[in-house]
């Protein structure tokens, strides 16, 4: 059965993930290293992991499998999800794929280096309504695609 794992710290689309999951009766694991407001929703499993680098990522990566979806803005976590056969979506709905993850990791490293050397100061553009809409469409499409393929 497909499950959705949300890397919830700084995730702007938690509610949208729950909305799509509810439509399909899927469990959503909202994983964070800080407290969250309880939802009381029967399909939502709120997981609070200890503080520390990559603890939430590790929790997700250890559990996600080939029929699952990982929602994250963390490119290394997306790479780990893909290695396990899971689908991975960014907050803006853009899918991470085997074909794109290498370039995404390289760009992440380049941008970090540019920030460290002072050659780049800002982040990306602000999260927009279009990003939210793209995310909803992409998550729906991903759920449908997983449901159409045979189980591993």
Swiss-Prot record:
Pfam families: DUF188. Residues 128-140 have a biased composition (Basic and acidic residues). Coiled coil: none annotated. It comes from the Bacteria. InterPro entries: UPF0178. Residues 114-152 are annotated as: Disordered. Belongs to the UPF0178 family. NCBIfam families: PRK00124.1 (NF001095). This is UPF0178 protein Plav_1521. It comes from Parvibaculum lavamentivorans (strain DS-1 / DSM 13023 / NCIMB 13966).
């Amino acid at each position: 059965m497909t499950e959705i794992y949300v890397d919830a710290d700084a995730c702007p689309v938690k509610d949208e993930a729950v909305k799509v999951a509810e439509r399909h009766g899927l469990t959503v694991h909202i994983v964070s290293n800080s407290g969250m407001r309880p939802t009381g929703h029967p399909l939502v499993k709120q997981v609070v992991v200890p503080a520390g680098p990559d603890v939430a990522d590790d929790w997700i990566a250890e559990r996600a499998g080939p029929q699952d979806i990982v929602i994250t803005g963390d490119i290394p976590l997306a790479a780990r999800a893909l290695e396990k056969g899971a689908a991975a979506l960014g907050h803006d709905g853009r899918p991470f794929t085997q074909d794109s993850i290498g370039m995404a990791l390289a760009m992440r490293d380049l941008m970090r280096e540019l920030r460290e050397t002072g050659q780049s100061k800002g982040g990306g553009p602000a999260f927009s309504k279009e990003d939210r809409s793209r995310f909803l469409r992409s998550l729906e499409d991903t759920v449908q695609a997983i449901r159409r393929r045979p189980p591993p």
